[in-house]
């Protein structure tokens, strides 16, 4: 069972004659260290338990019945000792919260053997730390430490002190952690002193006291092994790096052995890669980053490795490698702080390759999933530009464009484009639908009235009277100053006649006759259809008057074809 804090690493480059780098944002991986606190009669099996023993331990360990109120002190201590063993055992097999619950009943009990109290307090603090309750661990740690004030150091006390230091380290109270570790460092001996030195090294790293961190990290390494040794070496390397000794940091990272603890090993590979990158040895850096991605893909640090790797590829103009790495990165770490920037970079790569649909899909992920991103508006703007290209090639993308950006002028332009294209191809009815949709959904667009007028003319030509009425009415109602509004009124009136609404047509045509700017042709046309409208409602006298006046005007204009048309209409109207 392993856990690792989310690791965030930033690179800062300050120009001071040459590039200087600082590693920041590091966190020591949580390693569930379980100390062997000496020989306690009956405790050996408990203090050798491992995570894999959890099932057998829970099934085999049995607590005695709790003594009654009149129980003797020996009975009570025996019960509390068993309960303490059970709680420590639970923590050692990884059941931290359950272990803390059991130990909370005995942590304040005055055992006749103080060694038992040291074990209980140490594991009680570790249970709180490993379950993530750092503040409670710090609070109890302070209480325990107050009991040891001005008392001579011993190893049991040292483990409690170390655990209290760990609580402060993981809780972010680095200077306090350092001061707690100091008692073990100055007065203690053995493994607990060296673990305290390692903890102090990390506390100093967090406090940016790199020289102190380096000293503590180097002094403890001869006495540590396994994961604690690797943690000390990582601290040493980071301290050297941040003190400007990048070559020295590289040498340390190169000699760190794998531990089998994934968060620690992944951290070594990552920082080794980062160090080689700082030295401009990009191929070796990439090898280490790729190792993190391949072997530790389930850990957050692999996202950091992918982020750094794709930036190296971009710098080397290895576009395909960068693209594949970014895809890996954004698919696995959508919540990474750099995820939106990576998505935008990926979209731009696809755009440069004219793969517009893939470019659009990654831009869409930004503005659909990250509404608070600083790239939100930029991504939407870029997406509209891409849609404006692909919407002219595929009507499916046009409908997607309209759905996602219903107010986009580029979408309106694409509708006009399709209307014109279909009109040129002779597909008038399809063209009319595009023009009408454009005019209806973008009424404030400069070309909206023209689009509606074209659509209305097509409906009119094809005798689709209801559609024509609806379209021309929009123009008349919305654009009273449109340069073709009078024609729209005229076509509206005719469409109303053939749609079975002659009374409305008469109202429009009579209003049009009152215009002062009418020429004889316009007046004749209006009168002709006014006569037709009157005929439809059975007003023969008014119909004849209008048609005869139209006939005179057509004759004067030399429009003999229209004269014949009017004569035919008059033949059907009784006197």
Where are these regions (language model features)?
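Acidic, polar-rich low-complexity tracts and alpha-helical solenoid repeat scaffolds
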Residues: 2-575
């Amino acid at each position: 069972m392993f856990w690792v804090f989310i690791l965030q690493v930033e690179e800062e480059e300050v120009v001071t004659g040459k590039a200087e780098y600082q590693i920041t944002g590091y966190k020591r991986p949580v390693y569930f260290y379980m100390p062997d606190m000496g020989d306690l009669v009956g405790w050996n099996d408990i203090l050798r338990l491992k995570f894999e023993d959890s099932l057998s331990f829970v099934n085999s360990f049995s607590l005695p019945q709790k003594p009654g109120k009149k129980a003797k002190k020996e009975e009570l201590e025996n019960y509390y000792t068993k309960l303490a063993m059970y709680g420590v055992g639970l923590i050692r097999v990884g059941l931290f919260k359950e272990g803390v619950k059991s130990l909370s009943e005995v942590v304040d009990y005055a055992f006749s053997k103080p060694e038992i109290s040291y074990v209980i307090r140490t594991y009680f603090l570790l249970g709180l730390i490993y379950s993530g309750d750092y503040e409670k661990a710090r609070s109890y740690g302070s209480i325990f430490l107050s009991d040891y004030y001005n008392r001579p150091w011993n190893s049991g006390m040292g483990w409690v002190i170390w655990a209290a230091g760990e609580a402060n380290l993981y809780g972010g109270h680095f200077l306090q952690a350092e001061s707690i570790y100091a008692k073990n460092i100055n007065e203690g001996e053995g493994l607990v002193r060296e673990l305290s030195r390692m903890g102090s090294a990390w506390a100093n790293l967090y406090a940016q006291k790199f020289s102190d961190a380096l000293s503590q990290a180097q002094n403890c390494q001869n006495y540590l092994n396994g994961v604690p040794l690797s943690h000390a070496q990582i601290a040493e390397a980071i301290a050297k790096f941040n003190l400007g000794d990048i070559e020295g940091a590289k040498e340390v990272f190169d000699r760190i052995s794998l531990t089998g603890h994934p968060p620690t090993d992944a951290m070594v590979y990552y920082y080794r890669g980062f160090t080689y990158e700082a030295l401009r040895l990009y191929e070796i850096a990439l090898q280490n980053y790729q190792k993190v991605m391949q072997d530790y893909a389930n850990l957050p640090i692999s996202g950091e490795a992918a982020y750094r790797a794709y930036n190296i590829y971009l710098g080397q103009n290895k576009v395909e490698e960068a693209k594949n790495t970014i895809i890996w990165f954004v698919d696995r770490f959508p919540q990474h702080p750099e995820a939106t920037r990576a998505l935008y970079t990926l979209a731009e790569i696809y755009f440069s390759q004219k793969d517009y649909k893939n470019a659009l899909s990654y831009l869409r992920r930004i503005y659909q999933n990250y509404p608070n991103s600083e790239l939100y508006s930029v991504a939407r703007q870029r997406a509209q530009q891409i849609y404006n290209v692909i919407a002219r090639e595929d009507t499916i993308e046009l409908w997607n464009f309209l759905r996602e950006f219903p107010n986009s002028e580029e979408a309106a332009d694409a509708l006009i484009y399709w209307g014109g294209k279909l009109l040129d191809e002779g597909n008038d009815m399809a063209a009319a639908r595009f023009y009408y949709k454009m005019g209806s959904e973008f009424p404030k667009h400069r070309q909206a009235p023209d689009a509606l007028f074209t659509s209305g003319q097509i409906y009119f030509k094809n005798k689709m009277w209801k559609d024509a009425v609806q379209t021309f009415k929009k123009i008349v109602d919305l654009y009273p100053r449109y340069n073709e509004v009078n024609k729209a009124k005229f076509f509206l009136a005719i469409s109303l006649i053939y749609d079975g609404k002659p009374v409305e047509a008469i109202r429009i045509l009579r209003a049009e006759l009152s215009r002062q700017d009418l020429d004889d042709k316009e007046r004749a046309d209006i009168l002709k259809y006014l006569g037709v409208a009157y005929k439809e409602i059975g007003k023969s006298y008014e119909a004849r008057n209008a048609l005869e006046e139209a006939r005179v005007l057509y004759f004067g204009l030399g429009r003999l074809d229209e004269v014949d048309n009017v004569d035919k209409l008059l033949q059907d109207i009784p006197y």
